[in-house]
């Protein structure tokens, strides 16, 4: 949407009413053959469906390429938007209910997950553990020959308000999204 709207600072409800936007979205999505309930399902569908391209997270492009390469098939080329990325950062949260034992367990888990060893293991799965590149030790996972840019500094887009996000999702679900392939 940002690109179709000329890269505003942030998408607003008013910008969703821009003349011609609906037609541009329809044209853009006309090339979508299948949609999926999750990014991992989409990767699996791509690997079994004989499709030519996939829009997905960097880590799932890497995962798909690892499988394609193991099967001796042509790998995907990663393409990054030049004007900003939507980043899935999966934060870890804790609700303090006054239980010191549970809080300590949470803090221990957090310390473990943030340890160099575990951060390295996470990076080995093709997931970045920070905004500024990857460790030299994991350069073989983030492969330039697949178009992966390990030294790219991630520049996130500014997310719209919750209300505007809900409006965007509603529009997508009701006006633009092709039905899922459902088999009973």
Q: Where on the chain are the PLM-derived regions?
A:
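Extracellular/periplasmic juxtamembrane helices and adjacent flexible linkers that interface
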Residues: 97-182
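Extracellular/periplasmic catalytic domains that process cell-envelope and extracellular macromolecules
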Residues: 46-49, 70-72, 83-87, 101-104, ...
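Second-shell loop/turn segments in exported
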Residues: 29-32, 95-99
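Residues on a specific face of well-ordered alpha-helices
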Residues: 1-2, 6, 107
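Structural recognition of the beta-strand scaffold that forms the well-ordered cores
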Residues: 52-57, 93, 182-183
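Small-molecule pocket liners
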Residues: 2, 88-93
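Solvent-exposed loop/turn segments at secondary-structure junctions
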Residues: 6-7, 59-62, 83-86, 97-99, ...
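Ligand-binding pocket segment of bilobal, Venus flytrap-like solute-binding proteins
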Residues: 4-80
């Amino acid at each position: 949407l940002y690109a179709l709207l000329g890269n505003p600072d942030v998408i607003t409800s008013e910008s969703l009413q821009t003349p011609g936007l609906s037609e541009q979205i329809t044209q853009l999505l006309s090339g979508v053959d299948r949609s999926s309930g999750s990014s991992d399902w989409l990767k699996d569908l791509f690997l079994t469906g004989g499709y030519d391209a996939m829009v997905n997270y960097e880590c799932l492009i890497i995962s798909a390429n690892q499988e394609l390469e193991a099967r001796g098939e042509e790998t995907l080329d990663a393409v990054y938007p030049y004007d900003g990325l939507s980043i899935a950062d999966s934060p870890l949260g804790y609700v303090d209910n006054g239980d010191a034992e549970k809080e300590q367990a949470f803090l221990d888990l957090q310390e473990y997950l943030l340890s160099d060893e575990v951060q390295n293991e996470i990076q080995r799965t093709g997931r970045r553990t920070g905004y500024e590149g990857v460790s030299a030790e994991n350069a073989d996972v983030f492969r330039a020959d697949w178009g992966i840019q390990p030294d790219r500094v991630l520049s996130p887009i500014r997310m719209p308000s919750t209300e505007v996000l809900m409006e965007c999702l509603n529009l997508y679900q009701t006006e633009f999204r092709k039905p899922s392939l459902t088999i009973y």
